[in-house]
Amino acid sequence: MEIPVEFLLEKTIIVTAVFTISLVIAMYSTYAERKVSALLQDRIGPNRAGPFGLLQPLADGVKFFMKEEIIPSSANKALFILGPSIAMMTACLTGAVIPWGSYLEIGGDQIALQVTDINIGVLYIFAVVSIGVYGVMIGGWASNNKFSLMGAIRASSQMISYEIAMGLSIIALVMTTGTLSIGEIVQQQTTDWWNIVYQPLGFFIFMVCSFAECNRTPFDLPECEAELIGGYHTEYSSMKLGLYLFAEYINMFISSAVMSAFYFGGYDIPYIETLGLDQNTVTILGTLFFFTKIVLFIFLFMWVRWTLPRFRYDQLMNLGWKIMIPMAIINIIITGACILLF
């Protein structure tokens, strides 16, 4: 079956746009991280590279490219290179099923601002995120360094533990919406209340698990400098280290987008239809509103990092297995009871 050229061109443009936006936001998240930490610590932050330090991410990128590529002599070279590649690849793939806006009307055609709206989009995100564990584990093991291996083991156990609670929290959301399509979940919220109204406990569980999945403070045990030097990427340098750091910030961006889409209406602006605007204007405003929500969640990630202390490892595991998972199961029971009664 021949694929229309227009379809290929449309999807190529959307894929390129999503990939580029993800990289740019990841770059400037590093700048925002420093500015937020400076704000909370009564400092100025980066202000040398360009006006207000806005060129600092570009300076960091040049620095990573110029650093020497070092592969330890005792490392498994193939897997050492493969680890950060897997981490970066899985971070970028998750954006394919997120609806970044409604649709644009161009030349009589409706162009959806989504790479693909598969009917199992929720499962796709969990499948891709699960593969990301291999990038961390392979990188830590291939380094042939005890600190790297310990960090990789910590990361794997942490991510697997919190994926269970995250999955259970999404089961309650799927019970409420009746679909696994992310596009349909967002579309339902444009004609009804946002899902945060129906699933406040589910959102809280999902948000906490997102912090753990992204290895962000207070869940940054896999790379805590005080115990493990740098964790699973201790032996990495140059762009291979840059790929791991980029993947972390892209994961933070995608997690913020998923939380916004699942629980806060995605691109939906309440009552915008009463303004009588044309479809393209509504879509553009909705996309800008969606990214505003994402930026607020990214700020929350950074705010928590610079205000809360790190958990001990036993506290981390106890929180995941003894508190978050039972809470998620209780949330499913409550959701089922509400569906039956109301």
UniProtKB/Swiss-Prot annotation:
Predominant cellular place of this UniProt entry's protein: membrane
Short name of any one Pfam family annotated for the protein: NADHdh
Catalytic activity: a quinone + NADH + 5 H(+)(in) = a quinol + NAD(+) + 4 H(+)(out)
Gene Ontology CC entries for this record: plasma membrane
Keyword Transmembrane included in the entry's annotation: yes
GO molecular function: NADH dehydrogenase activity; oxidoreductase activity, acting on NAD(P)H, quinone or similar compound as acceptor; quinone binding
Domain of life: Bacteria
Stored InterPro entries: NADH_UbQ_OxRdtase_su1/FPO (IPR001694), NADH_UbQ_OxRdtase_su1_CS (IPR018086)
Keyword terms, alphabetized: Cell inner membrane, Cell membrane, Membrane, NAD, Quinone, Translocase, Transmembrane, Transmembrane helix, Ubiquinone
Membrane topology listed for this record: Multi-pass membrane protein
GO biological process, one term: aerobic respiration
Compartment list: Cell inner membrane
Listed transmembrane segments: 7-27, 78-98, 120-140, 166-186, 193-213, 245-265, 284-304, 322-342
Leading EC class: translocase
Its biological purpose: NDH-1 shuttles electrons from NADH, via FMN and iron-sulfur (Fe-S) centers, to quinones in the respiratory chain. The immediate electron acceptor for the enzyme in this species is believed to be ubiquinone. Couples the redox reaction to proton translocation (for every two electrons transferred, four hydrogen ions are translocated across the cytoplasmic membrane), and thus conserves the redox energy in a proton gradient. This subunit may bind ubiquinone.
The name this protein goes by in its record: NADH-quinone oxidoreductase subunit H 1
The organism of origin for this protein: Cytophaga hutchinsonii (strain ATCC 33406 / DSM 1761 / CIP 103989 / NBRC 15051 / NCIMB 9469 / D465)
Primary gene name: nuoH1
